[in-house]
Amino acid sequence: MRTAFGRQFDVPDGYLNTAGIGVPPVCAGDAVAAGVDDWRRGAARPSDFDPAVAAGRAAFADLVGVAVDRVAIGASVSTLVGLIAAALPAGGRVLVAEGEFTSVSFPFAAQAVRGVSVIECPLEALGERAPGFDLVAVSVVQSADGRTVDLDALRAARASGTAVVLDATQSLGWLPTRLDWADAVVCAGYKWLLCPRGVAWLAVDPVSNLDLVPHQACWYAGRDVWQSIYGLPLRLADSARRFDASPAWFSHVGAAAVLPWLAGLDRAAVRAHCVGLADAVRTGLDLPPAGSAIVAVDRPDVADRLAAAGVVGSLRAGAVRLSFHLYNTAADAARVLDALT
């Protein structure tokens, strides 16, 4: 058992795979288990989960830096990006980074039947290339290797008329950034936000030119949720809640147990902790510091050597990806270096 930033974690030594699956605080796991136990005993009621959904939504808004009425709930990044892709005009042009995580790029590529084209370019060139495109979509931090996009360049591109869609899945939770200026921000909860799989959020700019249609309109997106269960007419919320999907209840229970805590932490201290460990590994491997919590190691036999040392990472794009979160320690970094040096 470890204690980090005031919470206990039952995370094993050498676990460096938050970029794949985040490990929740013990209290969050207990909250989900209690919810499942209520369900098993027939003690759960649908409305019981509304406070958890609201708490997670509010904390996500805080983390991104937007008003809560700009936030919708979903189940995955790809379905939320799909709403945006479907809103592009026929023949629209989209720019993405080379090797981008496909939950960001595939929904746009699937619109080829309407003449939408998706162009790849190097991550470092996105800001320069973006003007002239209808939309640029990119992860704030790249999943494969932890590189960070130049947000200032993208913000300048937006001023020229290009819509900007950001996936914060690999950044939110360790990288403090205010993203209220983007047209849309999507984020899955099960990595750095330490939530169960099945919860994601979408923050939308109400003055954006994105003409989103609530294709997954449901009772939970209603103006008054519990008065929107039966019958027409359509009566959706006036806020971003109109884009809500029905909540995966227990995922939101977990989110409510962890996100308010994350949102209340000293975010600069969290970043310094995570990046400090990652850069210590880079330095020990004669790699330059990168200012990222993710390290990609592409060396012969690295996967076998790390596995033998009890290090848990992921193989991504031909390299072993190691990710350092707030529950990791200097001992985890030392375990990597002992195995590889």
Q: Predicted regions span which residues?
A:
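Pyridoxal 5′-phosphate
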Residues: 1-341
